[in-house]
Amino acid sequence: MSNALYRGRFAPSPTGLLHAGSLSTAIGSYLEARSRGGEWLLRMEDLDPPREVPGAADDILRTLEAFGFEWDGEVVYQSRRHGLYRAALERLIASGRAYACCCTRKEIAATARRGLDGYVYPGTCRNGCPDGREGRAWRLRVDEGEWTAHDRLQGEHRQDLARDIGDFVLLRADGFWAYQLAVVVDDAEQGVTDIVRGADLLVSTPRQLAVYDALGQSAPGYCHLPVLTNAAGEKLSKQTLAPAISTRDAARQLREALAWLGHVPPADCGSLDELWPWAVANWSLSRVPAGPLQLPLS
């Protein structure tokens, strides 16, 4: 993809408002795209209504605008793209790469061992559901062997999917699309060439590579930025009660976030109109730390 126009994206989920961690990820994603003369897309990953906060999607957009982000094209909402995910799943079913699963979470927990990201599915329904039961979820049939994600900041990330993850869900039993399928379908359909996101998602990258492979698609490049943690070392998130960022004094907060990412603006860059051009001109991944960053930073 080296000869293609760089196309990045930021894809927040409206399960809460933006916090310092999501802001730093948005900044890194944006600057990597703009510093390379590329495009930056915005996608709302709103596929899990029970977890979503009413009004959060609009608030996220207002916050990004207040901080001076400028995205290319219209905002894409996953909730309006079910047909694309259904078509992809049907292709995987037709090729034998996906199969129906009737197992409940309780049944899996009773027989499976722990892996890198939850229980490793034991393959109960790989050759068909037990008699009298109908599968409601769909899983990707994972091949044996190691998958390697080449990350521009974190280096090589190797994972044996069959051993460490197992056949993973594409469509949940409750009818909601799984992240691993939707994110691949969207990035491929939108022509995303490079993904810059938080390092907490590095563990899921080999699964996405497997979906790309099963669909016959080329995978994008990856770069996983350091996550921000609280004083207890927990990733900033809704679950750890990370406070939402305020749009007041956006320039000061942008300066702080740039410093977290290894880019300290000069003292005479005081406004958003001054900070963004400086950041685009001076952005370099070589200055971004790879490991987690604990707040507050001195």
UniProtKB/Swiss-Prot annotation:
Any one annotated GO CC term: cytosol
Molecular function via GO: ATP binding; glutamate-tRNA ligase activity; zinc ion binding
Sites where the protein binds Zn(2+): 101, 103, 121, 125
Short sequence motif named 'KMSKS' region, residue ranges: 235-239
The record's free-text note on cofactor binding: Binds 1 zinc ion per subunit.
EC code(s) of this entry: 6.1.1.-
Nucleotide-binding recorded as keyword: yes
Cofactor(s) it depends on: Zn(2+)
Binding-site positions, ATP: 238
TM stretches of this protein: none
GO BP: glutamyl-tRNA aminoacylation; tRNA modification
Motif ('HIGH' region): 12-22
InterPro entries in the record: Glu-Q_tRNA(Asp)_Synthase (IPR022380), Glu/Gln-tRNA-synth (IPR000924), Glu/Gln-tRNA-synth_Ib_cat-dom (IPR020058), GluQ/Sye (IPR049940), Rossmann-like_a/b/a_fold (IPR014729)
Positions bound to L-glutamate: 9-13, 45, 179, 197
One Pfam assignment: tRNA-synt_1c
UniProt keywords, alphabetically: Aminoacyl-tRNA synthetase, ATP-binding, Ligase, Metal-binding, Nucleotide-binding, Zinc
S-S bridge residues: none
Top enzyme class: ligase
Functional note: Catalyzes the tRNA-independent activation of glutamate in presence of ATP and the subsequent transfer of glutamate onto a tRNA(Asp). Glutamate is transferred on the 2-amino-5-(4,5-dihydroxy-2-cyclopenten-1-yl) moiety of the queuosine in the wobble position of the QUC anticodon.
Family of the protein in this entry: Belongs to the class-I aminoacyl-tRNA synthetase family. GluQ subfamily.
Protein name listed in UniProt: Glutamyl-Q tRNA(Asp) synthetase
Species for this entry: Chromobacterium violaceum (strain ATCC 12472 / DSM 30191 / JCM 1249 / CCUG 213 / NBRC 12614 / NCIMB 9131 / NCTC 9757 / MK)
Gene that this polypeptide is encoded by: gluQ
